[in-house]
Amino acid sequence: MTAAAEARRTLHLGAFMRPVSIHTGAWRYPEAYPDANFNFGHIKRFAQRLETAKFDAFFMADHLAVLNTPMEALKRSATVTSFEPMTLLPALAAVTERLGLIATGSTTYEEPFHVARRFASLDHISGGRAAWNVVTTSNPHASLNFGIEEQMEHDERYRRAREFYDVVTGLWDSWADDAFIRDVESGLYFDPARLHTLEHEGQYFSVRGPLNIGRPIQGWPVIVQAGASEAGRQLAAETADAIFASARTLEDGQAFYSDIKTRMEKLGRNPDHMKVLPGCLVVVGKTIEEAQEKRAVLDSGVHYESAVASLSIALGTDASAFDPDGPLPDIPETNTSQSGRERTIKLAAQENLTVRQLAQRLGGYSGLAMVGTPKTIADQMEEWLEACGCDGFNIMFPYLPEGLDDFVDKVVPELQKRGIFRSEYEGPTLRENLGLPRPKNQFFD
């Protein structure tokens, strides 16, 4: 192998599996599994297929509330029921060996001790394959499920998240890697000098510690983030090992990639220690025309009522009262996701879309989509990789199981043939497969 070939960058691939498709019409697609997000047998099969294809990770996002949308829209949604991620992923850990397992943990409605303990447990159960997707929870209806009338202000959620991260990682470092002696003869189970009590006192949390579970196999589970606002980008640059990005064009991807890596350099972090993975809906056909027809059938499954609900979520305001055939009116700022709102307003303006057209796009999928043959899809992925628009992708399958099987059976071999995706896992842990270092213990190393 030449030096150039050895130095060639390769893709990392995650699978976005909650909801089982980002597309609201997916459960209605011909021969799709309409119960795929609440059927363990199906999900087990999906995870095992992803592992066969050498995917880096299975990503299980989470929602802490049924969306408070009109029943005409809600009754058409397949996202009203799904497994709780930290119950599902240990079950998947038992039926897989190398696939990374990423779950969402809210920094707004959880407590650091609970999150630290759960993810440390998952890391041990899985043999070092756990990852924590750090979210501040933008859904304004979630607060009502926790006895809180008003959602926390956007930037304050991120300030709380930063302290939350410090507490969780401090708890993971409670024990030195060699703390547990388990000397049967002397009766000494652990070395007290290798235990650190956190004693954290901050603006949002008071946590004594230590954590009552040994240090995770990976040191820390992989830290994932998905914020795209100014506060979200900065949190990712400071803390994350991977970021799920939203970029509809290569130019957008390059700008985001450069911004995140530059922020890391300014903070003294190695930019190579962050993997930028844009979300990408992939529809595969034998020909480009067949793939486009599949996408058209998929989009035809979106009802206007559910499309308007998706638009309302993106904007953070009720869009059902807007004139469907008029332009998008001025949208006031809200306390939900800032980046999602800005992307939606920009899309409407750039393409001169009516409210109805915009809703249909949001109800289907308005982000990055690659619709074509295995070759043309691989061409696009290779272009993004070589142009520094990404380090890989968080793949969104259009429908299940066919969409997943098409990608695994047809696109992955094409990527492997080009030498831009692995044929075997690099190691047993998610950090090894992502090419990430094991964090040093801040109290003992």
For each feature predicted by the language model, list its residue ranges.
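An alpha-helical appendage that flanks or caps ligand/catalytic pockets
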Residues: 2-22, 155-218, 251-258, 262-383, ...
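N-terminal beta1-alpha1-beta2 module of alpha/beta enzyme domains
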Residues: 2-95, 218-221, 346, 441-445
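Hydrophobic, small-residue-rich alpha-helical packing segments that form membrane-like cores
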Residues: 4, 14-17, 29-41, 48, ...
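Hydrophobic faces of well-ordered beta-strands that scaffold small-molecule active sites
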Residues: 11-15, 58-60, 99-105, 130-134, ...
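Conserved, mostly hydrophobic/aromatic
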Residues: 13, 50, 54, 92, ...
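Short, acidic/polar
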Residues: 37-49, 225-235, 373-386
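Alpha-helix-loop-beta-strand connector modules within alpha/beta enzyme cores
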Residues: 73-101, 266-267, 407-423
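C-terminal structured "cap/appendage" subdomains that terminate the fold
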Residues: 381-426
